[in-house]
Amino acid sequence: MTELLSLAGVHTHIGRYHILQGVDFSVAEGQTTMLLGRNGAGKTSTLRTIMGLWQASVGRISLDGQRIEHSATPDIARLGVGYVPESMAVFSDLTVKENLILAARDGPLDDVRLEWIFGFFPALKRFWLSRAGALSGGQKQMLSIARAIVEPRKLLLIDEPTKGLAPAIVVGLIECFAEIKRRGATILLVEQNFFAARELGDTVLVMDNGKIVHRGEMAALASDVALQERLLGLSLETHQ
């Protein structure tokens, strides 16, 4: 498989804190890679560093063969990277339509692109002229993701999209991500919900204390409860 994203020896410091400590991994084109770990392991920090929100102190980050560790966030976005932060990235006072128009940096939204988005998120078509602040939590998350894919993306970085959502909404989001994946998207996804991770992931990376401590196939981790407990602190009750 073609390597789309790679990190080699990446360290990130925020003030006196050594957040990422020699992170090495790659993401293959067309794959969904889950980035798992306990709270504070460095998962969100990894996404922020890739996206240029935090600067790597040491190391190399490459996107499709191009070095980006010193690039600004807008430049990384222009290279085709979409980012969905943990806090839903929507403008509450604007309509769904206005939110998507603002996200389309390369020009007006055409009907073909809109129908492509509505294919993932039909609810957004129903609430096209509604203020984003009036949407439910699940609908806001859908809008946040739609903003990230309103333009063609090489890579999607998504941070805990199911956090705080009701189980029924989580199932709906999993179906949306599965469709995005079927259409060939490359995704690096941070997720605490192991059910969602198991359903979506092709490969998995586990972080602890700013380092990658496990890498492998998601199916292998999903079938090994003892390994889940050791790496993630999951208990048997988690699976019942």
PLM regions and their residue ranges:
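A short, proline-enriched helix->beta-strand linker immediately N-terminal to the Walker B motif
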Residues: V150-K154
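Catalytic Walker B motif of ABC-type/P-loop ATPase nucleotide-binding domains
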Residues: L156-E160
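The feature captures the beta-strand-to-loop junction immediately N-terminal to the Walker
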Residues: L36-R38
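ABC ATPase NBD coupling module
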Residues: Q55, R67-M88, L114, R126-L129, ...
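Conserved ABC ATPase signature
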Residues: R131-L135
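Helix-to-loop junction immediately C-terminal to a conserved catalytic motif
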Residues: M51
